[in-house]
Amino acid sequence: MHMLIPTAPTAATLSSSTQELLHAREIRKILIKLRYLPLIPVDYLGLHGHIHGSYQWRFKIPRALQTLAASDSWQDPWNPLVLGALYQFEAVHHLPVEPGDMGIRGLPPTIEKALVHAKKNDPDPWTWILVTKFPRPEEIHLFMGGHGWIFQSKANTGVMHATPDGTWPVYARDTHTAMIGRFPIPVPKAQVRLYEAAKSAGYALQSVHYARYHHHWVQYQHYDDPDIRWVNYFDRGRAVHFYPRASYGFPQSAGCVELPKSAAHKIYALIHYGTPVTVSHSAVGPWDPPGSAYLDAPQKSQQLHLTYQEIPSKSSPRSVHLQLVETAVKRPTS
């Protein structure tokens, strides 16, 4: 799984860029305007009467996505949802799919210039993959903005926690590729101790290499799979792809999310570069049923200016009663 793969886009693999033309806030604004990031800027009243900026989704989202969105600040340059929007923008504009030195900050000049001059909206619907480990069976769920949950299938994650929980955007895709790597085979601790004791006693033994993997003793078995289909890389060498198994729904892989053939083919056709992939220990309910009413159009939103206004009828020389007054602010036309 970890050999014949595209280099995962991380800050460590990128050279320093020149003076950036765009700040992270401006990049988010462009991605929102062109619908790569399906949000609407809104304002809200914070402590001490200060107005703060936030975002509202353009469609209804399930509880699990609400929890995910709340777990990362939109201002974080490595926010996986924002980074995924950037990857989709890059793919649509035939640019290298990569982050900057710091997520969406420090982008290469070619990508910044493309953002500045871009006019093409995202041609694909926004999608999100949720992989749940519990309750069993393990499953993959596909959410599409404006349509809700549109697909579900059994899936396999990695043995011995080889598929960590988290969220990453799809950064590379291939309909057909090869994977080479090492698969961890668990061995009993007693077997390791017996081998070490026999070797220390001077017995002539065939050399065996044991290693520690996620708090388990293992032996590694090399694999070379030349025909892996419908591959979506999201976290280094980990990908969502087809792999033939006798059954699905429990950990079996070396770290990837394995799917049955028909499911992998359908997922590949429905998602795109930048689709966030969330691996979760368990689902966050309640789940919205498939076919529930999702919004196809953005929810109406106004930027509000809030001020305090005195209520003379309730005021006196010793006390003043105030109420908040909302005034819609006209957005400048661009």
Outline where the language-model segments fall.
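Cell-envelope/ECM-targeting effectors and their regulatory/trafficking segments
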Residues: 1-187, 191-194, 291
